[in-house]
A protein has these predicted regions:
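C-terminal beta-rich recognition modules with glycine/proline-rich loops and embedded aromatic residues
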Residues: 134-136, 140-172, 180-185, 190
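Surface-exposed loop/edge segments in extracytoplasmic proteins
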Residues: 80-84, 199-204
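Generic structural detector for well-ordered beta-strands
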Residues: 55-57, 95-97, 173-175, 185, ...
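Single conserved hydrophobic/aromatic residue that forms the stacking wall/gate
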Residues: 210-219
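Short beta-strands within extracellular/lumenal beta-sheet-rich domains
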Residues: 47-55, 165-174
Length: 220
């Protein structure tokens, strides 16, 4: 048998400042209007994210219920992030206090992956696969936008002033002086995805590190 190969050389880079941002809506390309919510599969999308938007016309403090959420949702009201829900913990509702109507409700849902075995393989559509309730009232009149975030879509984004507090795209530039394997430390972030020079590096949560495969020169 051949000898075990030597470890790849490693390198490092300085802290990257992400001072440029693009709004989530910059990646919107094909929005579908529907009376009821639609799943990713209904729109011919297999992976990524899907954005739902509708209007709440009844003020008050009550539960927003997302039936059959798959898999992770960020909820915004009038452009402000107010809650998140995670299917892994059987979370499907949150209490909101709506003072002013009409209020714009946005739900950004992430497809976190699929199973390929067991009985759940038959019930594995992604997005919101049933309905959304505001109290006992079914919400209708949805604008639905799939966000598969293909390479060309991400690479063509126009960046500007920094955006904080809501889902968005952020960009920074760094230089690798010496080729080698390295890590992108996202421990101070929440949840999202990383691209290097337009190539998808992977998704992250705040407890994970992602390996960057020997980037060279100036990257963003």
């Amino acid at each position: 048998m051949p000898e075990v190969p030597a470890d790849n050389p490693t390198t490092t880079f300085a802290t990257i400042e992400l001072k440029e941002s693009a709004p989530l809506q910059a990646a919107f390309h094909q929005t579908t209007e529907s009376e009821n919510v639609l799943s990713m599969e209904d729109l011919g999308v297999d992976f990524g994210y899907i954005h739902y938007q509708t209007t709440i016309n009844k003020a008050g403090k009550q539960k927003l219920i997302i039936q059959d959420l798959r898999d992770y949702a960020v909820i915004l009201v009038d452009g402000k992030q107010v809650a998140s829900l995670d299917r892994r913990y059987n979370q499907n509702s949150t209490t909101l206090d709506i003072h002013k109507v009409p209020a714009t409700l946005e739900i950004l849902v992430e497809n976190t992956g699929r199973v390929n075995y067991g009985p759940d393989i038959l019930f594995n559509r992604k997005g919101i696969t049933s309905q959304v309730l505001w109290g006992n009232e079914k919400l209708t009149g949805w604008s639905i936008t799939p966000l598969p975030l293909y390479k060309e879509e991400v690479s063509s984004l126009s960046f500007g002033q920094e955006i904080k507090g809501v889902p968005a795209f952020h960009r920074g530039t760094f230089i690798i002086e010496q080729q080698g394997d390295c890590f992108v430390d996202m421990s101070q972030w929440g949840k999202g995805a990383v691209w290097v020079n337009g190539k998808s590096l992977g998704r992250f949560w705040n407890c994970l590190l992602y390996t960057s495969p020997s980037p060279r020169d100036s990257t963003s």
